[in-house]
C-alpha cells in the first residue's frame, strides 16, 4: 500500500507494512549512532514521525526527464547514504511498519511512528531560500517562494478550509435553486468607479477588452434574460492602489434575485448564508436578524460606514448644539472619561498627530478647567458658547479628555478623522489595559443602510459621483430630490459589516430605463462618449426587465475571517505584492516587440524609462 496522504485514522494500520510518500521535514534528531528520528509531511500538511534504526540503502528512482549524467552522479554519491543525509524538503517514499509511539511520547495528532525499512528518493530539493513555516525571511522572499511556503501545515490548512467554505457556498445556493452562471471575463470598459485592467484585441486593432471589476452589468442582464435567481463565485479585477487587505484580482460571492424590490429580501438570504458558514467554520450560531443602522448613524456615532460595534467610545455630532456656521461643515467630538488616568497628554497629542486633519485635544483634570476647556479648542474659541451647557449634554467632567475636529458634511471617503482616531484610541487603551481585549471569536455583524446615493468628487469636470455604482435605485421617498438635491437622495444600498470589516455591499437596482438614463445623463452628467458605454444596459432595461437586486460578498475577506488568518494574503494561493507583482512567476513582464505589433500596441519612451 502506497499512500501520499495519511489516513484520518491510522490505528487500523498499526503493525502493517506501508509505504508513504511525502516531503522530508527539516527537523531531525540523532539519539545514537544507529537511531535517528525524522519527520515526513504529506499533501495535507500532516506530520508523521519516522524512526530509523539501521543504515538504509537509499534507492534512487529514475525519472525519464532526468539526464543519465545527472542520475549517475547522484547515484554514485548516495547509494550508501542514510535518511539523515537526504536534504530537507526532498520528496521521498518511505516503507516500514507503522507502530504506536510510546505512551509517554504520544500527543494529539502525533501518536504514531513509522519504523523505516526502506527509502526511495523521488526528487531531491536543492538551493531552497526558505523552509515551510519559516517566517523570518522578508515578505518578498516568502512570496517568491510561495510554493515552498504553501507546504507548511498552516498555509495548507488555510487553502483547504477556503475550499471547504466554497463547497458550502455552492451547496447553499443549490439548495435554494439559484442558477450558477459564469459571466465573461472579457468585458468592455465602462466608467463604474475603479480603474480597470485592459486587454488589447488582436482581431480588432485599436480596441480593447476590460477585465470586469464585478459581474454587475452581466448579472443585471441575466435578470432580464429570465434566469431568476443567479449566483457565482466570481473572479474580479481592479487596477487600484493596493493595501494589505486588497489584491488586484480577487474573488466574490456574487448573487442577484429577480422580482425583488425591497432590501430585506436580499438581506435574509445573505444572513442565512453567513449563519451557515459561521456555524460550519466556527461552530457558532449567529442570532438573526442582524442589527441594522443607518449610514448617518454609523458616521455620527462611529465615524465610519464600516463600524466596529464591539466596543463603545462613541462620537457625537455637535453641529446642532453650536451657533450656525457653514452648512457644509460638521463638528464631531469624542469624549473619553479617563478615570484611571491611563492616557497622558503626550499620548493624546500623538493620537491627533497620527490622524492629522486638524484634530485637536484638551484634557480636563481640575474643576476650574470645566469652564475654560472650550477656549483651548480652535473650533470653539471664537464661538459664543456656554461651557456648562456642553458639559451637561456631552457628560464632560473632571478627567474627561475631549477630541474634536471639523469635517465636511458630505464625505468623500467612508471614515471621518475621529472615526480613525477612535480605532487608534481603543488599540492604545487595550495595550495599556485600560480596556479589556476584544473576544477573538466575537462576530458582530451589522447592516448599514440608507447610504447617500451620490457623493462629492474631487474631479474638476464632475461635481458628484455615485457612492457605489450608477445602477443603485434611489430610495422611494427621495426620488423627487434627484433633480434639485441629489446629495440628499438616499440609495437602496446595504453593506454587511463585521468587526469593522466591510464584507460586501449590494442594492436594489434601477430597472426603469428612464430613471437609469436620467441618473447617467442629468445627475452624473456623463459626457456623450461615456454615456454611450451604457447603451447596451439601457436597451436591456427597455426590453422588459423585472425589478431586481443583489449583493457581492468578498470571499477572500470572509475566508480570512472564518479561518482566523491574519489577512487575505494567507487565504489566496498566489497573492500579489503591494505593487501588483507575482514574485514567484515574475509577472507582470515585458512582451516581445513583435507580439506588441500583432496587438497594434506601442510602448512609449516615457514608459520604457519608467520601467
From Swiss-Prot:
A GO molecular function held by the record = ATP binding
**What EC number(s) does the entry state?**
6.1.1.12
Taxonomic superkingdom = Eukaryota
What is the enzyme's class at the highest EC level? ligase
| InterPro entries assigned to the protein according to its UniProt record, in alphabetical order | Aa-tRNA-synt_II (IPR004364), aa-tRNA-synth_II (IPR006195), aa-tRNA-synth_II/BPL/LPL (IPR045864), Asp-tRNA-ligase_1 (IPR004524), Asp/Asn-tRNA-synth_IIb (IPR002312), AspRS_core (IPR047090), GAD-like_sf (IPR004115), NA-bd_OB-fold (IPR012340)
Q: Name the Pfam families for this protein.
A: tRNA-synt_2, tRNA_anti-codon
Q: Where along this sequence does the record place binding of ATP? A: 238-240, 502, 554-557
This chain belongs to the protein called: Aspartate--tRNA ligase, mitochondrial
- Native source organism of the sequence: Schizosaccharomyces pombe (strain 972 / ATCC 24843) (Fission yeast)
| Source species taxonomy | Eukaryota, Fungi, Dikarya, Ascomycota, Taphrinomycotina
Per the record, the gene is msd1
Amino acid at each position: 500500500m502506497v499512500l501520499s496522504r495519511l489516513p484520518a485514522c491510522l490505528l487500523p494500520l498499526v503493525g502493517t507494512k506501508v509505504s508513504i510518500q511525502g516531503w522530508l521535514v527539516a527537523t531531525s534528531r540523532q539519539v545514537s549512532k544507529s537511531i535517528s528520528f525524522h519527520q515526513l509531511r504529506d499533501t495535507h500538511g500532516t506530520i508523521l514521525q519516522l524512526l530509523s534504526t539501521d543504515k538504509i540503502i537509499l534507492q534512487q528512482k529514475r525519472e525519464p526527464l532526468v539526464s543519465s549524467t545527472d542520475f549517475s552522479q547522484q547515484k554514485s554519491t548516495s547509494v550508501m547514504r542514510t535518511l539523515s543525509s537526504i536534504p530537507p524538503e526532498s520528496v521521498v517514499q518511505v516503507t516500514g511498519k507503522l507502530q504506536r509511539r510510546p505512551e509517554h511520547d504520544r500527543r494529539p495528532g502525533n501518536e504514531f511512528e513509522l519504523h523505516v525499512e526502506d527509502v526511495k528518493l523521488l526528487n531531491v530539493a536543492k538551493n531552497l531560500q526558505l523552509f515551510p513555516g519559516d517566517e523570518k525571511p522578508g515578505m518578498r522572499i516568502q512570496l517568491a517562494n510561495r510554493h515552498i511556503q504553501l507546504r507548511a501545515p498552516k498555509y495548507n490548512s488555510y487553502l483547504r478550509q477556503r475550499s471547504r467554505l466554497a463547497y458550502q457556498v455552492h451547496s447553499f445556493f443549490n439548495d435554494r435553486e439559484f442558477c450558477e452562471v459564469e459571466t465573461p471575463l472579457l468585458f468592455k470598459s465602462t466608467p463604474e468607479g475603479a480603474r480597470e485592467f485592459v486587454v488589447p484585441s488582436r482581431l480588432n486593432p485599436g480596441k480593447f477588452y476590460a477585465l470586469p471589476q464585478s459581474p454587475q452589468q452581466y448579472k443585471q442582464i441575466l435578470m432580464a434574460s429570465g434566469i431568476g435567481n443567479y449566483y457565482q463565485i466570481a473572479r474580479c479585477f481592479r487596477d487600484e492602489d493596493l493595501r494589505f487587505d486588497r489584491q488586484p484580482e480577487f474573488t466574490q460571492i456574487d448573487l442577484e434575485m429577480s422580482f425583488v424590490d425591497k432590501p430585506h429580501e436580499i438581506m435574509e438570504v445573505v444572513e442565512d448564508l453567513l449563519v451557515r458558514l459561521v456555524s460550519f467554520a466556527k461552530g457558532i450560531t449567529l442570532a438573526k436578524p442582524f442589527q441594522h443602522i443607518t449610514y448617518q448613524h454609523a458616521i455620527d456615532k462611529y465615524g465610519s460606514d464600516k463600524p466596529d460595534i464591539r466596543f463603545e467610545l462613541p462620537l457625537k455630532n455637535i453641529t446642532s448644539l453650536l451657533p450656525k456656521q457653514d452648512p457644509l461643515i460638521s463638528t464631531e467630538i469624542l469624549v473619553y472619561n479617563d478615570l484611571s488616568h491611563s492616557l497622558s497628554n503626550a499620548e493624546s497629542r500623538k493620537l491627533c498627530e497620527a490622524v492629522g486633519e486638524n484634530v485637536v485635544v484638551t484634557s480636563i483634570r481640575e474643576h476650574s478647567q470645566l469652564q475654560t476647556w472650550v477656549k483651548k479648542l480652535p473650533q470653539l474659541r471664537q464661538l459664543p458658547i456656554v461651557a456648562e451647557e456642553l458639559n451637561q449634554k456631552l457628560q464632560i467632567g473632571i478627567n474627561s479628555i475631549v477630541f474634536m475636529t471639523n469635517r465636511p458634511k458630505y464625505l468623500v471617503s467612508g471614515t471621518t478623522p475621529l472615526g480613525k482616531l477612535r480605532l487608534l484610541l481603543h488599540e492604545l487603551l487595550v495595550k495599556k489595559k485600560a480596556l479589556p481585549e476584544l473576544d477573538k471569536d466575537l462576530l458582530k455583524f451589522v447592516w448599514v443602510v440608507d447610504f447617500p446615493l451620490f457623493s462629492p468628487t474631487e474631479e474638476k469636470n464632475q461635481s458628484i459621483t455615485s457612492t457605489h455604482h450608477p445602477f443603485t435605485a434611489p430610495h422611494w421617498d427621495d426620488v423627487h430630490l434627484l433633480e434639485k438635491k441629489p446629495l440628499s437622495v438616499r440609495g437602496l444600498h446595504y453593506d454587511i459589516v463585521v468587526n469593522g470589516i466591510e464584507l460586501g455591499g449590494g442594492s436594489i437596482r434601477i430597472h426603469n430605463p428612464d430613471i437609469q438614463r436620467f441618473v447617467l445623463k442629468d445627475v452624473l452628467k456623463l459626457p456623450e462618449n461615456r454615456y454611450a458605454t451604457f447603451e447596451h444596459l439601457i436597451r436591456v432595461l427597455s426590453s422588459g426587465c423585472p425589478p431586481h437586486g443583489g449583493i457581492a460578498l468578498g470571499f477572500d475577506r470572509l475566508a480570512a475571517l472564518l479561518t482566523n488568518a491574519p489577512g487575505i494574503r494567507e487565504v489566496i494561493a498566489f497573492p500579489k505584492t503591494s505593487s501588483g507583482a507575482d514574485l514567484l512567476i515574475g509577472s507582470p513582464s515585458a512582451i516581445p516587440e513583435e507580439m506588441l505589433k500583432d496587438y497594434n500596441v506601442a510602448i512609449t519612451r516615457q514608459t520604457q524609462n519608467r520601467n
